[in-house]
UniProtKB/Swiss-Prot annotation:
It is an enzyme of class 3 (hydrolase). The active site is at residues 38, 346, 349. GO terms for biological process: lipid catabolic process. Its main location: secreted. It comes from Arabidopsis thaliana. Lipase that can hydrolyze p-nitrophenyl butyrate and p-nitrophenyl palmitate in vitro. Possesses low activity against p-nitrophenyl acetate. Substrate preference is p-nitrophenyl palmitate > p-nitrophenyl butyrate >> p-nitrophenyl acetate. Lacks cholinesterase activity. It catalyses: hexadecanoate ester + H2O = an aliphatic alcohol + hexadecanoate + H(+); a butanoate ester + H2O = an aliphatic alcohol + butanoate + H(+). It comes from the Eukaryota. This is GDSL esterase/lipase At3g26430. Lipase activity is inhibited by phenylmethylsulfonyl fluoride (PMSF), but not neostigmine bromide (NB). InterPro entries: GDSL, SGNH_hydro_sf, SGNH_plant_lipase-like. PANTHER family: GDSL-LIKE LIPASE_ACYLHYDROLASE (PTHR22835:SF117), ZINC FINGER FYVE DOMAIN CONTAINING PROTEIN (PTHR22835). Its EC number is 3.1.1.-.
Amino acid sequence: METNLLLVKCVLLASCLIHPRACSPSCNFPAIFNFGDSNSDTGGLSASFGQAPYPNGQTFFHSPSGRFSDGRLIIDFIAEELGLPYLNAFLDSIGSNFSHGANFATAGSTVRPPNATIAQSGVSPISLDVQLVQFSDFITRSQLIRNRGGVFKKLLPKKEYFSQALYTFDIGQNDLTAGLKLNMTSDQIKAYIPDVHDQLSNVIRKVYSKGGRRFWIHNTAPLGCLPYVLDRFPVPASQIDNHGCAIPRNEIARYYNSELKRRVIELRKELSEAAFTYVDIYSIKLTLITQAKKLGFRYPLVACCGHGGKYNFNKLIKCGAKVMIKGKEIVLAKSCNDVSFRVSWDGIHFTETTNSWIFQQINDGAFSDPPLPVKSACTR
């Protein structure tokens, strides 16, 4: 009997080592608080500067949803997996429900503050430090208003949710492309990356000081494989790899990611009560782009929604752009007809199909450190 019990334990242990997801505890996160840029913006920039036009949102929401994609983003799939509603943008005052979290991300956001990057990124003034201010204000005001009772109690999070929530970070890509816009060399961009990580680390420390304990951090994508980077910041043919990606741009991203992982390791030691999950988005997206055909995708370096050129990307005519010709409105940048098979949505962001595939890889735990699914991200 004892021998059989020991055998069962050994089999279970081996199974857990091979498939850690199957043996991981569920954390029952009651809320998500997200910080980021357009990769996870669910309506922040649209609420501030006007809605991202149709065909953004065409696939899932069937109308513009504040997202720069035809449908759902990775953060939406994370919410679904945790059994939570999609996150409303903190800046969106129309019909928002913050009972299970809030999204502080806005498209174009950078880690570094405006005095360092606003002239470079040229899009959003809502950098990560501003998102932190918004979050801090949200903690205080949400509880003051929730205590009024009635409908306010239903629309705002419970106080304890702030210490039990999952805190997600997906930001940094715009800090790197900001350097490209200033014609900086790879070495010049790499030189300011430590400052980017200093400021990101400081924000995480401040969230920790306000009760945050579960952190889910994405690294940055292979920049050299994004259609808009290939179009706007071309490199000589000798610096293009076999898959059509710009080698020096990907080298910048890899350096950023290696340093980010080192910072996460340091934060684990420093903030001993916190659980950190570092997610290797770079490797997942690179796998998808370099093995697109094998995985059932088409034209990984060509935007689905765009206007002309090798990469179907035009910085002056972006997805959904229209013109008036003889009193008639004409859409110049339309969606492709095979969006469910495409990788890139608009040359910058990804399609819903791509985001879904990426999330499946994330949730397997194989690309995360520690190798856990999102439901178990409270594990230290």
